């Protein structure tokens, strides 16, 4: 399991990040969308998915 940082801009152009533990980047995105209401409403607003080593 790896740690991923995911980032996005909201409608006010404010940048946000969340950290997720997952087996791969696809699973990290799924977890982030489950955890963040904005990403549920705007699922394709993610612009950064980075594995933290």
Task: List the predicted regions and their residue ranges.
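Short aromatic-glycine-(Arg/Gly/Cys) micro-motifs in beta-strand/loop hairpins
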Residues: 1-16
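A short, exposed loop/beta-hairpin motif centered on an aromatic-Gly-Thr core
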Residues: 13-27
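Short, mixed-charge low-complexity intrinsically disordered segments
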Residues: 15, 33-53
């Amino acid at each position: 399991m790896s740690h991923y940082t995911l980032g996005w801009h909201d409608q006010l152009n404010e940048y946000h990040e969340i950290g997720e533990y997952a087996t791969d980047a696809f699973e990290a995105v799924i977890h982030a969308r489950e955890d963040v209401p904005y990403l549920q409403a705007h699922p394709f607003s993610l612009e950064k998915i980075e594995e933290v080593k």
